[in-house]
Each structure stands twice: as C-alpha cells, then as structure tokens.
A protein has these predicted regions:
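A broad, low-amplitude sensor of folded, mature protein cores
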Residues: 4, 9-10, 16, 49, ...
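Short, solvent-exposed recognition patches
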Residues: 40-135
C-alpha cells in the first residue's frame, strides 16, 4: 500500500478514485432533458388589480397558445397601483404587460420601455400604440397612454408576438366589494 500513497502513483490513484466518484455521481443523479418554465396563476392579481385600481385594468382575455405566464407583481404604494404580468412566449422570448396610474405617465412608460424615444406607431384593433425600441437590450415596447393610466407591452419578443399580446387585452370588470365581517 505504501507505493499508492507516495509520488506519481499516489497522485494517479487519487485522481482515479475522484473520477470514479464523479462518474458514479453522474450515473445516479436524475437529469431532465426537457425545458421547465414555471407557470404562475395570475387570476388573483388580475382581480385584485381591478379592485384596487382607479383605472380600467387590461388583462389577456385568454393566454396565447404555447405562452406561459411566469411572473406577476401587483403593487399599491401611495395610491399608485401598478401591475406587471410576464410571459415566456411561444418562441421562448420574454413579454411583459405593465400598467400603472403613476404620474407623470411618461416616467412610468420610459422606465418600462427603457427608452424615451418613440420609433413609430402601429394600429392594433383600431387603437394606436406607440412603438419604442432599445437596440442594446433588444427590447421592443408598445405603449398606450390613457388620461388616467398607461399600458406598456414590452420585452425581447418580436413585434408580432407583442402585437398578439396587445390584441388579447380586454378590460377587466370591477369585482364586487368584499363583504366585511362584523
């Protein structure tokens, strides 16, 4: 045993033992070859946004085929209601719907679009949306500013996918007030 603990033989033996251990570990470790994108249920945030917001909340009437809703965030701070809803698109890009009654609306829009430079406009179901593009982030944005709030559809998704998301947006009804116990 002495010759396996000294010199080059010891080094080679230790290396062989380590490689055998790594090989055994790789054989018994489960490996998934399928992509897993976590899915979130945004229905509660959709209802709560419609309840809390002073403006008409827009939400997808139906999630597009092969799209996965993967994030939702509803914040209410100092009377400002902001809802963000993120998706992994069918082409595995990112798209997000963001809306808020933050004032001035331009600050919210510029922050969500990561640019303050309009690049054109497009008609989507009779409504005019402003286009913005930030090349260094590969971020496209569609913007609509209403008198009481702003809506931004943005992400790395291409214009067609962002337009498809904008087409699904529908006003959400205000839910009935929650009865208080008392």
């Amino acid at each position: 045993m002495g010759r396996f603990t000294q010199g080059i033989y010891g080094y080679a033996f230790a290396l062989l033992v380590c490689l055998a251990a790594v090989g055994a570990f790789l054989l018994v470790t489960p490996q998934s070859r399928t992509e897993h994108i976590p899915r979130v249920d945004f229905s509660i945030d959709r209802v709560n946004a419609a309840r809390a917001a002073s403006y008409e909340v827009l939400a997808p009437g139906q999630v597009l085929p092969d799209w996965v809703p993967n994030s939702t965030s509803l914040t209410e701070k100092n009377g400002v209601v902001t809802w963000r809803l993120g998706f992994a698109t069918a082409k595995r890009q990112h798209a997000m719907l963001a809306q808020s009654d933050e004032k001035p609306s331009a600050d919210f829009v510029n922050r969500m679009a990561n640019t303050d430079k309009p690049g054109g406009s497009r008609q989507i179901d009779g409504a005019t949306w402003e286009e913005r593009f930030r090349q260094d982030k590969n971020q496209r944005s569609l913007v609509r500013v209403f008198p009481d709030h702003a809506v931004v559809v943005t992400g790395t998704a291409d214009w067609d996918e962002l337009t498809a998301l904008a087409r699904t947006l529908a006003p959400q009804p205000k839910p009935s007030p929650v009865p208080s116990s008392g």
